[in-house]
Swiss-Prot record:
Keywords: RNA-binding, Transcription, Transcription antitermination, Transcription regulation. It comes from Edwardsiella ictaluri (strain 93-146). The keyword Zinc-finger does not apply. The gene is nusB. Involved in transcription antitermination. Required for transcription of ribosomal RNA (rRNA) genes. Binds specifically to the boxA antiterminator sequence of the ribosomal RNA (rrn) operons. SUPFAM superfamilies: NusB-like. This is Transcription antitermination protein NusB.
Amino acid sequence: MKPAARRRARECAVQALYSWQISKNDIADVEYQFLSEQDVKDVDVNYFRELLSGVASNAEYLDGLMAPVLSRQLDELGQVERAILRVSIYELSKRQDVPYKVAINEGIELAKIFGAEDSHKFVNGVLDKVAPQVRPNRK
């Protein structure tokens, strides 16, 4: 699968996770609705599904990794940034095949696309602190 298809999968995952976080609907329903309503022709759909289900089923674990390094309380974190950080930390901790630098860079790029002004700097800072904990060998 092309890297661009993976990037699109990450973008879609952030959008779907944002919806899940706000609506509190079942993740399977969010996935079905997203795939039926969005254009996913250039998306690695299998990777999208993995990110969505993986983040949803590991949300507490992922939040536990990021909470100690945040400059604010977890519940004060914006929902967009939370979705982006969850995807990136999921890749760092659960997808050893995704290179360390790729996971961090993709998180930064997602923040540039979806986040508020300068949120990419915040995301970068959090990932720089979390990454060595879950990838001590930096690979």
